[in-house]
Amino acid sequence: MSGMHGASREALAAARERLDALTDSTSVDAGSLADELAAVTALLHREVSLRRVLTDPAQSARPRPSSPSVSSAPRSAAPVDLVAGTVRSRWSQSRDLVDALEQLANIADLTAAQKRGRLDNVEDELFRFGRIISSNTELRAALTSRSATTAAKSELLAGLLGSRAERTTERLVTRLVTAPRGRSLESGLESLSKLAADRRDRMVAVVTSAVPLSDTQKQRLGAALAKVYGRPMHLNLDVDPEVLGGIRVQVGDEVINGSIADRLEDAGRRLAS
């Protein structure tokens, strides 16, 4: 989804603005909206020919075909209007429309968590789940197996997350696992984490240290990184005794080793004084 260009990027930005306006209304249940958007996403992912017709620029000069399946997927007016506006936009390729609808569904779920004051928990849980997956090959194999049924994967996730994680976390991960749409589990979790951070207009730093950081160290490192990057910074923390230099910080594609991190902290203190 991050690879959208040109018309698709503009269409996605407009769709996200419409979604934000919709979820700002107290009468709209963001969680239910997420379910309905996810249903449309699944439908258009299956119906490739329909998706291509809906995104064909040649159709823009005349009414687009109406599909009973698409029109009946959302059950209330709000998602119908949102989906209709998104479909009417110009998309560079048909897959971009499905990617956009999926992203809208995920954002709606994250918005629901934000309204409940639970977004920080969801961010942390997505990161921790990613770390569990990377260290447990058997679990990863079970969740990505093509021979396992959707029901079996959902049941496994319910057992893992149901009583331990936020409901939003379970919903997001379950959708990703049961409908990966060609993505790896790791890249899907990373995309979800970025969306969660984006809800607060902040960046994510993955901090791996040889020993757990103290609260003071976390606060100082977060403040220093925020000053350097010019945006609030959410720290995803991991401990690995084999980390060279004692600490490793990754912000996007940029990796910062321990010595540079120390200089960042010093710079942050000087700016604050």
Curated annotation (Swiss-Prot):
One of its GO terms (molecular function) is proton-transporting ATP synthase activity, rotational mechanism. It is a peripheral membrane protein. Residues 57-78 have a biased composition (Low complexity). Keywords: ATP synthesis, Cell membrane, CF(1), Hydrogen ion transport, Ion transport, Membrane, Transport. Signal peptide: none annotated. Residues 55-78 are annotated as: Disordered. The keyword Transport applies. It is found in: Cell membrane. F-type ATPases have 2 components, F(1) - the catalytic core - and F(0) - the membrane proton channel. F(1) has five subunits: alpha(3), beta(3), gamma(1), delta(1), epsilon(1). F(0) has three main subunits: a(1), b(2) and c(10-14). The alpha and beta chains form an alternating ring which encloses part of the gamma chain. F(1) is attached to F(0) by a central stalk formed by the gamma and epsilon chains, while a peripheral stalk is formed by the delta and b chains. F(1)F(0) ATP synthase produces ATP from ADP in the presence of a proton or sodium gradient. F-type ATPases consist of two structural domains, F(1) containing the extramembraneous catalytic core and F(0) containing the membrane proton channel, linked together by a central stalk and a peripheral stalk. During catalysis, ATP synthesis in the catalytic domain of F(1) is coupled via a rotary mechanism of the central stalk subunits to proton translocation. Belongs to the ATPase delta chain family. PANTHER family: ATP SYNTHASE DELTA CHAIN. This is ATP synthase subunit delta. It comes from Streptomyces lividans. The lineage of its organism: Bacteria, Bacillati, Actinomycetota, Actinomycetes, Kitasatosporales. The gene is atpH.
